[in-house]
Design a protein with these regions (language model features):
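Extended, charged low-complexity regulatory segments
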Residues: 1-175, 179-187
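Pre-Walker A (Motif I) flank of P-loop NTPase domains
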Residues: 190-194
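Hydrophobic anchor at the beta1->P-loop junction of P-loop NTPases
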Residues: 196-198
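Walker A (P-loop) phosphate-binding loop of P-loop NTPases
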Residues: 201
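Conserved lysine of the Walker
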Residues: 204-205
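Walker A/P-loop NTP-binding motif
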Residues: 208-218
């Protein structure tokens, strides 16, 4: 498929994902408005409203922030056209009527291969695709083949560009650029005590914050 066609297809998926996220928030807003209308005690009603309010806030969409930053094509051994495709992003976005997710939360177990798979250990993945964005607009993609016969690829230019982007203002997340050894730390079991060491600017604080986000998710 020509690159322009691929970009068009991926932009369509991004638009569909944003529409689905809006639908999720609208449904939550309706539930929030109806909370307490069917009776029940005041404490239960207030707890429900607080839960729904937090979910409404969590479902707010910032059009300048990409909903997803990567894609995994899981090898089903039935041909590339029948691969299971999974988009990896900062939050879970459900399909219509709770069907297959349009975007999988980066903290979910199914997203682990995005960070750890390689040609020597593909973890069932045929293709890993990274996306480049500019102010929320999908502008580029980069494919890394991991299936049978694949060889270790050169370093990703999109990944390098994101890692080397100047750090200004508040600390930004690193979910699109987490490295395999960092991912192991982020997803370590709750019972494990970790000591993360490194020189200034090597990402110690970012790893710690993303580990906290992972533990809250799990």
């Amino acid at each position: 498929m020509p690159d322009d066609d691929v970009l068009g297809h991926e932009r369509a998926h991004l638009a569909a994902s944003r529409a689905a996220l809006r639908a999720m928030r609208e449904a939550t807003t309706r539930h929030f408005a109806q909370a307490g209308g069917a009776g029940g005690n005041a404490v239960s009603t207030e707890v429900l409203k607080q839960v729904l309010y937090r979910r409404m806030r969590a479902l707010e969409d910032d059009p300048t922030v990409p909903l997803f930053f990567g894609r995994l094509d899981y090898d089903t051994a039935l041909g590339a056209e029948l691969d299971e495709i999974l988009y990896v992003g900062r939050r879970h976005v459900s399909g219509e009527l709770g069907g297959d997710p349009l975007v999988m939360d980066w903290r979910a177990p199914m997203a682990v291969p995005f960070y750890r798979a390689g040609a020597d250990h593909p973890m069932g993945v045929r293709l890993r695709r990274r996306f480049g964005f500019s102010h929320g607009v999908l502008t580029a993609f980069e494919d890394e083949w991991l299936g049978a016969g694949a060889v270790s690829a050169a370093s990703s230019q999109l990944l390098a560009d994101e890692i080397e982007r100047p750090r200004m203002g508040p600390m930004r997340d690193i979910v699109a650029t987490i490295q395999p050894d960092q991912d192991v730390l982020v997803r370590s079991a709750l019972a494990e005590s970790l000591c993360i060491q490194g020189a200034p600017g090597t990402g110690k604080t970012a790893v710690g914050l993303h580990r906290a986000a992972y533990l809250l998710y799990s």
